[in-house]
Amino acid sequence: MAYVLTVASNVNMREPSESKESESETSDDAASDDDDEEEEAQPASNAYATLLQSFSTRHAGSDEHRKKRRKLGHEEAPQEDVSDAEGASVYGTPEGDGTVVDPEQNETDDEAADEDDGKEQELEKAYEKHFASPDENELATRLKRIATNQWSSQKLTCGSGTTKGFGVLQIPGEEVQPPPRKVKSVHDIQLKQRLVDNALKKVGNFDQVEQTIAPSIFGYQDLLFGARTVQNAARLRDITCLHALNHILMTRDRVLKNNAKLAAAPDDVDAEYRDQGFTRPKILFLLETKQACVRILDSITKLHDFEQQENKKRFLDSFSQPEDKFSEDRPADFRELFEGNDENEFRIGVKLTRKTLKLYSTFYNSDIIFASTLGLRRAIESGDPKKKDYDFLSSIEMVIMEQADAALMQNWEHAEYVFEHINLQPKDAHGCDFSRVRSWYLDGHAPNIRQTIVLSAFITPKINTLYNKHMRNVAGRLKYTADHTDGLIESLSYGIKQTFVRFDSPSHLTDPDARFKYFSSSVLPSITRLPRTAEAGGLGVLVFIPSYLDFVRVRNSLVDSDFSYASISEYTDATDVRKARSHFMNGKHSLLLYTGRAHHFHRYNIRGVKRVVFYGVPENPKFYDEVLGFVGKSIERAEISRQEASVRVCFSKWEKMELERIVGSKRVGRLVRDRGDVFDFV
């Protein structure tokens, strides 16, 4: 069940300078168009002429037959590439789907494909069933069930101890069919032969959790994985990159084989092979930082051997920085996210040819797009507002969102905006050969064929909404969460009394008002009654506020009060932060208002904290632990006794998901439903 909170979207943080963005987005495709023509034969660019030709009788000679299937629009001059930051398109000249490869490549790849045929039959079946030739009756039935939200479910349990987790597999069919066999290693997923050796070396065997999610990943089902950690991040990255590469090679080989069949077909036979989309890009990686983009590229290049990587130095100069700017005392998840280049506005196209990986290709000439949600939204909205260009997303067949929990700390509206613009019918032809476009693209079913993989450290109501709205795959979907039976609270050893207080909140729509009323009428008066300690005059009360809008509301309410307070938000400049921390530590200010996003972006180590009030339950349970640690260190420094220290958590019944991660699933029901509204833990 999805719990929906009406929390206003946050404002984006960490935007790069315009000059850097311009440098990172300028495409090199225009300069290398001639080289591309030598390596790849593009499909026809006159879409409507080709469509008409496909219905006519083939009575011309072999030259005429080939003309129907080759690019016709060479007379059209390429557009000049200009950076998005300057308000113009970064896409360059549209060149169609682009998965057709030149005759020079046909001979080599066809021989390899023939050798692989016997070994890849099972994989071909999965690809054939989902993408190439789905059964029309079965597809119609499943689409109808999805439209009426009819899913058959099966619960999955795997792992033990810290790796234990639970999954819910849903299929829009009569019943959930178990996978035909266990997927224990890369041997069991029947990769394209050219990926096997590297996959065995770099990925190898799957652990228990990976064995649970691998059938969904390689079976083209949607996956919401809510148990991403620093420890399993690299493995998840390698597995998803392996799947993405495998899909690109599957698509390319299918087109090559069909090209050969078309070339060999008699002139009096009107053969038709629907094996493409409207545009070329097939894979979209939604990433949080430029450094995350570097890690994805590293994974791709270690799984597939490319003879050349064009523009690699330029890419590293713009996207990569040394990953040693934070000391070891910072939390591991913070260092993983923000080490290196933490800019979060970027987008870059990647083109894969027979021997080469080309960075900075134009979107319409790319196989893969790496982007942040902010960067992609600005690419769509650049230029004339009435002529937004999102056609390059029309044929995306796989979306991989790597750190959804971090995206929540940016502006989640960007993620919603991007998903709303994926797989829409294109406004222009872009050189598409409609006779090669798959039927389900033409029928508008691409959103239900697309595979979406979302990786997150935890699941929130907003992520659940994304799952319910945009992850509606005809092959099914799997939601996997970590085990929260005991919750974080059982692992804490501070010995501090923690009081959870539930306030009445009739509706999630009015929850912010009910929360503020409770805080103003109950929490603030109780703070005024707190005794001052003899050694340090300040009360040392830190008020942790997850939402910035709530923070502004509380801060404004204190302006005319008798409280001496300081505040730190994500927008507070460094000088004011130092002043606020200093005055709070020495007791000049009794209250410190501290936002969740300020903690996310900086992980300040705040001294002088003797008591904590959580205005709301943090979505990230690590924040709860770290803020309690402020009090623990005050106790160690003998600034307050363990008996005097306290923690108070204000919550409503709409925060069940956040509570579960802290108090545990075995207790959360009692907290949100019991008649009593005060619950103490030590």
UniProtKB/Swiss-Prot annotation:
Biased composition (Polar residues): 43-59
Comp. bias regions, Basic and acidic residues: 120-133
Chief place of localization: nucleus
Acidic residues composition bias: residue spans: 24-41, 104-119
Location of the protein in the cell: Nucleus, Nucleolus
GO CC term (a single one): small-subunit processome
Entry's Gene Ontology molecular function annotations: rRNA binding; U3 snoRNA binding
BP term (GO), one: maturation of SSU-rRNA from tricistronic rRNA transcript (SSU-rRNA, 5.8S rRNA, LSU-rRNA)
Any one Pfam family match given in the protein's UniProt record, by short name: Utp25_C
Source organism, top-level taxon: Eukaryota
Residues covered by region (Disordered): 1-136
Keywords assigned: Nucleus, Ribonucleoprotein, Ribosome biogenesis, rRNA processing
Self-association state and partner proteins as the record states: Component of the ribosomal small subunit (SSU) processome composed of at least 40 protein subunits and snoRNA U3.
Family: Belongs to the UTP25 family.
Function description: DEAD-box RNA helicase-like protein required for pre-18S rRNA processing, specifically at sites A0, A1, and A2.
Name this protein carries in UniProt: U3 small nucleolar RNA-associated protein 25
Organism: Pyrenophora teres f. teres (strain 0-1) (Barley net blotch fungus)
Name of the gene this protein is made from: utp25
